[in-house]
Amino acid sequence: AFVDMELPLPEGECMLAPRVEARLLQALQVQKTDKVLEIGAGSGYMAALLAHRAQRVISLEIKPALAQLARANLQKASITNAEVREADGAKDVSVDGPFDVIVLSGSVAEVPQVLLAQLKPGGRLAAIVGNEPMMRATFVTRTGETGYTTTQPWDTVAPRLSNFPEPSRFN
């Protein structure tokens, strides 16, 4: 049975609620030919869901214990087209790009330009953007070399991804 809540993980982290993961996945319309980048592997659950639909998944996880957990879970599930790398998703993203799909499995204050640059034309990015208590599911599609379209169809809240910049605030 599934519980629709943010399930706790080691190192004080938690998974996105399954309902949120399902809605992100549905909106991205991942295809069998897609190369996918996930930022924030966590338990490996989202990587497993993505791998079921995509050609290849690279999932970056900054915390060694979580990267190890995600690798073990993917191996237990006999998933061979998803790879978990110990890396900082806020910085180390250009190794295998560009990507058809990018998923941020956690929230950010804003979608970094460095990630948008890793989308192929026609590529899709999903993130939860904003600051508590107001965050929105955000979907960005690259329409050309410099063009992007963005939609924010629903409100949600998610834990912050590590090392992504916070907006400057006036004191």
Language model feature labels by segment:
Residues 29-145:
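Conserved nucleotide-cofactor-binding alpha/beta core module
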Residues 1-29:
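Conserved AdoMet
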Residues 130-171:
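Active-site capping/gating segments
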Residues 3-5, 10-11, 95, 136, ...:
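Glycine-rich, flexible loop/turn motifs
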